[in-house]
């Protein structure tokens, strides 16, 4: 029994709130503009985890009123054929967002494929033009997971201005764009990674600690500053002795919640927010094509999760 327990940052409930807001917008816009937003998720091959993720995204689209135009393509597809499919979707007026589900089979280099997606349909925020807009603090499509983290912090009234934020991980999917978003929000940002020396001393300096390492329970309670906000982006599938699997984060959750002030669970923290921001990006892209520039989300303060 711990004497103190951190407030749980409930990404699942917040994601549901975002979905409701987006669904209201979509109903209004469909009546005005005569069509619904469209998202195309491209899955290549038969990776089981990818199948689960794509199914979750398509189900979320259905709840909000976004049409799905995705495709499941064979693992043997050539780069030329996949580029042709992306070009087709770029030109399809029904499609407002395109997402290439990663990872790809080994013979496919994701970079030219991601770069082939039109920047205005790049709902994953990975095109160089959108990353450049992020660097320049200009409007553009933002990477879904980092954007979800920022929405989660805002919804719980966690002010990042002037606070020390450490991001553990430097991937183009999470670490780098999140560091830029925190910097844009006037946090004092440090990035740690696999080559960083004395990782524990770096993480203990953080008032806001974000982990995106892909190493189950790597961050232990003694690596966390008392009272820190801990955001666990890691999703690690661990096989149990009974043959079933569990999802673990990068943080030792039960121990860390006795030290932190706020913490995200795994699952139910950042994961649902990633999907919610994918929906947001799709609707945002759809709105831009109709010259509608108003914010889509109005986040109310989230109560502490039970």
Swiss-Prot record:
One Pfam family linked to the record: THF_DHG_CYH_C
UniProt key word Electron transport: no
Binding sites annotated in the UniProt record for NADP(+): 169-171, 194, 235
Keywords from the named record: Amino-acid biosynthesis, Histidine biosynthesis, Hydrolase, Methionine biosynthesis, Multifunctional enzyme, NADP, One-carbon metabolism, Oxidoreductase, Purine biosynthesis
PROSITE patterns: THF_DHG_CYH_2
GO annotation, biological process: L-histidine biosynthetic process; methionine biosynthetic process; purine nucleotide biosynthetic process; tetrahydrofolate interconversion
Domain of life: Bacteria
GO annotation, cellular component aspect: cytosol
Pathway assignment: One-carbon metabolism; tetrahydrofolate interconversion
Catalytically driven reaction(s): (6R)-5,10-methylene-5,6,7,8-tetrahydrofolate + NADP(+) = (6R)-5,10-methenyltetrahydrofolate + NADPH; (6R)-5,10-methenyltetrahydrofolate + H2O = (6R)-10-formyltetrahydrofolate + H(+)
EC code: 1.5.1.5, 3.5.4.9
Stored CDD domains: NAD_bind_m-THF_DH_Cyclohyd
Molecular-function GO terms, alphabetical: methenyltetrahydrofolate cyclohydrolase activity; methylenetetrahydrofolate dehydrogenase (NADP+) activity
Family: Belongs to the tetrahydrofolate dehydrogenase/cyclohydrolase family.
Quaternary structure, from the entry: Homodimer.
Function: Catalyzes the oxidation of 5,10-methylenetetrahydrofolate to 5,10-methenyltetrahydrofolate and then the hydrolysis of 5,10-methenyltetrahydrofolate to 10-formyltetrahydrofolate.
Protein name, entry field: Bifunctional protein FolD
